[in-house]
C-alpha cells in the first residue's frame, strides 16, 4: 500500500495503517506537500502552493502533472526494489492526493489498483459553486474542455477503483453521495471513509 496524502504523510499515515492488514505500508510527500511544503500547513488560497502552481503554468506545465510524475517514479522504484515475484501495489490517495493517485493509476502500465478517500466526484461541480476551497494546483488547466473526473474514474473501472466518502467543492463530505455519483455518472465502488480508519470490511453507502 502506498499512501498519497492530502497534506502530510506523517500526519495521515495512521488513517490507513489499520486497513493495510498484512500489506507493507509506504507513504510519500510529493513536491510541495508535507516535508517539502513551502510555508505553514493549512488552507491558504494565495500562499506558496498557489505561487508554485502559477510558476508551472508560466513554464507550460502544471503542479498536478509534476506530482503525478513524482508518484509514478516512486511506484517504479517500489517495483524495482520488491523481492516478492507476486508483488502488487495499491495506491491510496486522500484529498489532494486522491486526484494525483487517480491520474497515476490510469497512467501506470502495471495497472495498480487505487482507493480514493475524500476525492472530488467532479471538477465541473467546483465551477458550479460560488466558492471552491480545493487548491488551484489540483486541476489541470483546460481539463474540462476535454474530460472530467467521472471520465477518469470510468477509465479506471470499478475493478481497480474504490471511492471512500467523496468531498464537495468546499472539501466536506458530499451529501447523498450515492445519488450524486449517479447524477455525475461516476461508476466506482462507493464506501464510507471510516472503513479505512477502522479497518475491516467497508460498509457500503
What are these regions (language model features)?
Residues 1, 24, 88-90, 112-115, ...:
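Hydrophobic beta-strand segments of well-ordered beta-sheets in folded domains
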Residues 1-2, 12-18, 28-31, 39-42, ...:
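Composition- and surface-driven signal marking solvent-exposed, interaction-prone regions
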Residues 3-81, 85, 123-133:
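Cap/lid segment of the alpha/beta-hydrolase catalytic domain
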Residues 10, 58-66, 90, 139-144, ...:
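Short, contiguous acidic/charged loop-to-helix segments that flank catalytic cores in large enzymes
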Residues 30-32, 116-119, 166:
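Active-site loop/turn elements of alpha/beta-hydrolase fold enzymes
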Residues 41-52, 130-143, 180-195:
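Acidic, Ser/Thr-rich peripheral helices and adjacent loops at domain boundaries
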Residues 74-146, 150-155:
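Primarily recognizes the serine-hydrolase "nucleophile elbow" in alpha/beta-hydrolase
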Residues 103-109, 123, 145-205:
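Serine-hydrolase catalytic core
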Amino acid at each position: 500500500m502506498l499512501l498519497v496524502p492530502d497534506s502530510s504523510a506523517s500526519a495521515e499515515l495512521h488513517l490507513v495503517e489499520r486497513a493495510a492488514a498484512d500489506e507493507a505500508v509506504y507513504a510519500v510527500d510529493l513536491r510541495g506537500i508535507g516535508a517539502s511544503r513551502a510555508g505553514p500547513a493549512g488552507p491558504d488560497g494565495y500562499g506558496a502552493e498557489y505561487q508554485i502552481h502559477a510558476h508551472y503554468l508560466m513554464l507550460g506545465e502544471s503542479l498536478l502533472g509534476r506530482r503525478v510524475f513524482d508518484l509514478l517514479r516512486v511506484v517504479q522504484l517500489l517495483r524495482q526494489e520488491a523481492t516478492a515475484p507476486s508483488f502488487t501495489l495499491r495506491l491510496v490517495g486522500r484529498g489532494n492526493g486522491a486526484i494525483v493517485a487517480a491520474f497515476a493509476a490510469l497512467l501506470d502500465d502495471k495497472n495498480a489498483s487505487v482507493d480514493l478517500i475524500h476525492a472530488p466526484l467532479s471538477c465541473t461541480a467546483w465551477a458550479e459553486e460560488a466558492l471552491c476551497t480545493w487548491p488551484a494546483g489540483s486541476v489541470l488547466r483546460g481539463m474540462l474542455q476535454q474530460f472530467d473526473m467521472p471520465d477518469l474514474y470510468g477509465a479506471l473501472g470499478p475493478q481497480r477503483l474504490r471511492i471512500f466518502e467523496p468531498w464537495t467543492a468546499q472539501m466536506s463530505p458530499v451529501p447523498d453521495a450515492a445519488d450524486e455519483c449517479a447524477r455525475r455518472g461516476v461508476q466506482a465502488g462507493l464506501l464510507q471513509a471510516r472503513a479505512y480508519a477502522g479497518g475491516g470490511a467497508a460498509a457500503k453507502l
